[in-house]
Amino acid sequence: MDPPETVRGFILQPTYRIEGGRPVVHLYGRLETGETFLVRDRRQVARFYVRSRDREAARAAGVSGIAETDRRTLTGEPVDRVEVARPSNAPPLRDRLHRLGIPTFEADVRFAVRYLIDRGIRGSLEIRGPWQGGHAAGAAASGVDRVFDEPRLAPADWTPRLAVLALDIETDPEAERLLSIALHGCGASEVHMLCPEGAGCPAGAIGHASEAELLAGFARRLRELDPDVLTGWNVVEFDLRVLLRVAERYGGLLELGRGAGAVRLSRSWRRGPAVASIPGRVVMDGIQLLRGAFIRMESFRLDAVAREVLGEGKTLASGNGGREILRLFEEDREALAAYNLTDARLALEILERLQLVELAVERSRLTGLAPDRMGASIAAFDFLYLTELGRRGMVAPTVGAGEEPPGETAGGQVLDPRPGLYENVAVLDFRSLYPSLIRTFGLDPLNLLPEGAADPGGLVAPNGAAFRREPGILPALLDELFPRREAALAAGDRVTSVAIKILMNSFYGVLATPACRFHSPPVANAITAFGRQILLWTRNRIEEGGRRVLYGDTDSLFVETGEADPAAARRAARELAAALDRELAAWIEERHHVASRLELKFERLYLKLLLPPTRGGGRGAAKRYVGLVEEGSGRRTVFTGMEVVRRDWTDLARRVQQELYERLFAGRPVEDYLRDVLAELRAGLLDELLVYHKGLRKDPSEYTSTTPPHVAAARKLPGPLPEVMAYVMTEAGPEPAGHLRHPYDYEHYIDKQLRPVAEPVLDLLNKSFDALVGRGYQMGLF
């Protein structure tokens, strides 16, 4: 045993194991020395709470181990602590109490997460105590460098650089037979391939004589490379799931961790993505990292994302599928190895270019959650709020234990657009509106007064909810986060600024979500009610000053500047935003007696802006507009809510819409262009632009009452079904792309793809789409 020392580390995986009949916390991670570590602690007791007045009823229900505490509920009632021998004993006991009408508190907090909450540890920690090498500390620690048993822990400020390894496998068309495995990262870039005796193995590939040997060799090599993070594209749902299936077929376990234990797949909720657990490591799927970072992509397929982010794609077209992979395995293994390795490399390079692993680490350091839980906004809120509640001697209800049914929440204010084509339109934006409202008015579940309760000095929101004028948990957290984000922006630290922005913006959504223990319709509605009040106040002040507001949505207003020169328009917009900011602060101080934390900024200038009418004319269409902006030395057309940015429209519609608005803004003719498109379409020259893409949310056989086009096409597709169905409309209905038996239905595309994108532009020019298409044209039925 080495002498005590103090060292900083970062937690990759908080979990626990049962040892000697008792739960033992296990924290796996990486130290600032570069070594890996495991903290083991037997001192944590699994617990939850019940109201003190329910003590005897709980005992009658078979609950033992009840002890008095000095803690209270959010409404001020005293509570008792219920201790259980194992964390797994808590759920059935909790559910039994709920069935008897006895509410519980914090009976659903994960055991290892509770350990971190109790100590205020978020991601990074300081460890002080003796340690021993992992090889001498038992099977659970065999793959780590240092093992600390019951050390002293404290929060720390340290950011690690994690070792990341990308994995990609290739299989036969049925995803039953494993053909090759590529690994890229941690200093390696290699392909392990099934090469039975007598079969040639390509130069540079590592051959294995059987599928079982291929799997074992891969697992051994992964443990040698010892990554902190295992990643890939759809790596959990496909790669790891297939590898587990292969391991089961050979009667073994898939062991890839830093300690004893097989890879496990699970779902945190029924329709959520699968998550993988590997002892001591984190599995981060590239697709989920993108989505968790709120990065929008036209398609999340690896080829599409790689082309958009890196400027290069896969070496084979994705439409070739498993049959092409099998052909390469049989005829050209060198090409298969190159394809396999390219997929692994692209997956890792996308994460590196977008700094997605760094973002996950920073979000872990902010929220306390493990870095593979990027999308868990409710759990992040839970961690932060429960930590602060604990410091105040309070407990929160168990999710689902509340006595009141979930209430409805109202959204933000949307002003009816004034349809038309405008010049020099300024967008004024309230920065981080909902977090700023929480800070300004002290909106917090802890400050919410019970309905009907009187507080002469309280603050009343526009929805009627009343709040104490006391420091709340959320306002205090935001008071800490806002300056940290400003400092990160000033330092050019994009990762930290994005992580903080995502966290701050999640607070309102969590309060409005019934699945959250702190779900509070009065608080959520107070936030949006203040938002609506302030947006309308700002709109009225602008129009009282003689300018028109053309559109508004939640936190932004589109203002007609009335200036002919763009430079003058920008100057006027900045002056207007600054003046409104001052007036609003004075109004809030006078009306509500609080200091405004709101900030209205000039965001951008549209040199030209089109607000289209709804289909059928009349009113403007909310959340749909297109404008021309200056960027650097050039100009760019920006679409919001239009067909060009939606995946369920074809490339034909997107390409035509883009070109039409660029021509409209540039004053170039559109009719001749549309005639050319129609002629090329009917001549079959644009067939590659006619593919629809639609996700398959369930098996086609499960659609019984209706059959959407993509489902009808899927039923005609031979072989395994993709996650996203590619299909075209033919004269015989929808058919899978690449498997057509009938001619394209060009009139369908004219009616359903060209008409919707062309008519708004033609209407502005007083032109008719039907006249352009040709005399006697009738709308198709489908």
Kindly label every feature range from the protein language model.
Residues 2-226, 341-342, 346-365, 369-411, ...:
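DnaQ-like (DEDDh/DEDDy) 3′-5′ exonuclease domain used for proofreading
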Residues 4-8, 16-36, 351, 357, ...:
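DNA-dependent DNA polymerase catalytic subunits
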Residues 167, 200-205, 224-229, 287-288, ...:
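Glycine- and acidic
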Residues 191, 200-205, 209, 226, ...:
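Active-site-proximal helix-loop-helix substrate-binding element of RNase H-like nuclease domains
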Residues 218-243:
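Proline-aspartate-enriched helix->loop->beta-strand connector
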Residues 255-256, 281, 305-309, 313-392, ...:
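Mixed-charge, glycine-rich, non-catalytic linkers/tails in nucleic-acid processing enzymes
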Residues 335-350, 480, 484-487, 530-537, ...:
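A non-catalytic, amphipathic alpha-helix used as a structural packing/dimerization or gating element
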